[in-house]
């Protein structure tokens, strides 16, 4: 009887630990041969990006939903910036001892967001979120990354990321990598933000200096 009780307690502990592990949102980093690898994770999605700090060169990014077994993330990719060369749509990533947790303070807007619309010249234009072409922003523990991609064709249209904070209605991001233009690395951009009816209204100027008003909705 005691043995069975111990076994039940151990099994419950394993289940509880697994649930806690799956519910974590963290940002990790490790370096290899001068290349920074950053991993942003929430309870069901993972994005890994590689870039060089010394030259500001973006190398690649992959991302998608995952199932976790032990220290291994089995991923079904939604995007792969190197897909034309390697055709990889599924991958297993192992969390290793050299992964350093670099998570910062959790800010407002934490989570995955899909762009659902824009406002141009006072006119609001909406997107169908079910279409394969998507623009997603992933905000976890003080870090952000946006990605434009097509889930059907694996066409990759661009990505950028870095650190962000939210304070007094301002969303402020510092760019640490940018696939389209390395010269934008180091820029700090400030936007007004407001969440209205669960939609994030994002207003300001783009990295090119153009006015923008984007509307984003949370992705599960």
Question: What do the predicted segments below correspond to?
Answer:
Residues 20-159, 172-220:
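Lipid interaction determinants
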Residues 162:
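Phosphoinositide-binding peripheral membrane targeting modules
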Residues 1-27:
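Bacterial Sec-dependent N-terminal signal peptides
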């Amino acid at each position: 009887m005691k043995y069975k009780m111990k076994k039940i307690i151990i099994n419950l502990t394993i289940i509880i630990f697994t649930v806690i592990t799956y519910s974590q949102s963290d940002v990790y980093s490790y370096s290899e041969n001068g290349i920074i690898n950053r991993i942003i994770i929430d309870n069901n999605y993972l994005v890994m990006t590689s870039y060089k700090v010394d030259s500001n060169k973006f190398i690649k990014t992959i991302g998608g939903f995952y199932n976790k077994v032990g220290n291994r993330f089995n991923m079904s990719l939604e995007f792969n910036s190197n897909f034309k060369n390697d055709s990889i749509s599924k991958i297993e990533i192992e969390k290793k001892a050299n992964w350093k947790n670099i998570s910062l303070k959790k800010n407002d807007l934490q989570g995955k967001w899909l762009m659902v619309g824009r406002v141009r010249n006072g006119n609001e234009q909406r997107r169908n979120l079910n279409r394969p072409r998507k623009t997603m922003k992933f905000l976890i523990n003080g870090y952000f990354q946006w990605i434009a991609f097509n889930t059907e064709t694996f066409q990759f249209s661009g990505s950028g990321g870095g650190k962000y904070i939210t304070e007094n209605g301002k969303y402020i991001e510092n760019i640490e990598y940018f696939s389209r233009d390395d010269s934008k690395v180091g820029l700090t951009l400030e936007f007004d933000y407001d969440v209205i009816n669960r939609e994030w209204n994002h207003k300001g100027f783009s990295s090119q200096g153009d006015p923008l008003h984007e509307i984003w909705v949370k992705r599960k």
